[in-house]
Amino acid sequence: IPASARLRGTIRAFRSEVIALLEERVRAISENIAAALGCTAEVTVEQVTLPVVNDAGVNERLRAVFQAVAPGVQLIRSFQTMAAEDMSYFLEAVPGTFFFVGSANPECGLDYAHHHPRFDFDEAAIPLAVELLAAAVASYVLPGAQPDHVE
């Protein structure tokens, strides 16, 4: 029987309060199980990133912009992912939104998940991504380019 054990994992959530609660619970459960067995537990939490939290107002603004510049594009409102991104730090400081431009293309065999060894993306999605990003910026910096005026 080994004298010590090491467990490692990742804690992710959609809200910072939930991450704090999970950290507290992991610590309490670990220490109490160890104490019940006559051992000690040391819990170290290294937070790598914050949750990515989009601003609802920015989301709605960009939704209108994207529908105006690319009316045929499918906008999925309910998609959630526990992305671990540097973007979370920007969104904590400034209202913004983090969005994906899908590129799956089953006809070309380009529909594997991001962490799959055969993942690749269809470069044909790049022009749409550029168009959406340019329209997003334009809606904030060009006079008259607000969503109800984008052509």
Predicted features, each with a name:
Residues 1-151:
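Metal-dependent amide/peptide-bond hydrolase catalytic core
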